[in-house]
């Protein structure tokens, strides 16, 4: 098992009881110790606009704690989210067929599905996308007034007026983003799950894994 983790600044977003980074840490811990109980080698790769850390697959409880400590200690990385460098690194470094969990919000300006790198990785390995989402990313708050939004990665900010038209337009952008990702995952092909940070992320992940066993 290889867990590839997005550690860009957008993963720091948290408007519910957990940030996306906290949610992915819980998910990572669950995957690590599940793999350990099944006596499966496990490793991790951390990335933002480049690969920032790599721990090759090993089978030891101490390695699980090392991975979690290194993950939690990683400061938010500057720059935009770019998945292709991580995908290329995984293709190069993983010699044996591996289950790869690609954990990212996929908030990126690059077309990760263009160029075929992800399809090449998925042809050799079992790749599963895990997409954590904060409630603030899926809908604007109710009520009237003005809301200032800031991109955690670029630092750009803008103020919008809260009204029904703005909520409808925002909802349409979210739907288009979901549709684009879903269609891309289908073309690769690869399994995926959108996990909300205001819900039990482990239960959501277990639902995905259980559905894979039934397939």
Locations of regions flagged by a protein language model:
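Exposed, interaction-prone extracellular/peripheral surfaces
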Residues: 1-29, 33-215
């Amino acid at each position: 098992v290889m867990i590839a983790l997005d550690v860009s600044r957008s993963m720091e977003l948290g408007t519910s009881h957990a940030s996306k980074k906290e949610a992915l840490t819980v998910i990572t811990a669950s995957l690590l110790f599940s793999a350990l109980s099944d006596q499966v080698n496990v490793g991790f790769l951390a990335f933002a606009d480049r690969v920032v850390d790599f721990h090759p697959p090993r089978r030891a409880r101490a390695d699980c704690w090392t991975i979690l400590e290194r993950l939690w200690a990683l400061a938010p990385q500057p720059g935009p989210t770019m998945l292709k460098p991580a995908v290329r690194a995984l293709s190069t470094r993983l010699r044996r067929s591996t289950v790869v969990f690609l954990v990212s919000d996929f908030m990126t300006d690059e077309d990760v599905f263009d160029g075929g790198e992800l399809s090449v990785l998925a042809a050799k390995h079992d790749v599963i996308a895990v997409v954590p989402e904060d409630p603030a990313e899926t809908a604007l708050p109710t009520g009237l007034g003005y809301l200032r939004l800031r991109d955690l990665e670029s630092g750009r900010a803008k103020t919008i007026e809260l009204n029904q038209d703005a909520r409808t337009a925002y909802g349409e952008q979210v739907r288009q983003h979901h549709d684009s990702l879903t269609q891309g995952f289908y073309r690769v092909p690869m399994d995926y799950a959108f996990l909300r940070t205001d819900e039990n992320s482990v239960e959501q992940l277990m639902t995905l894994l259980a559905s894979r066993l039934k397939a």
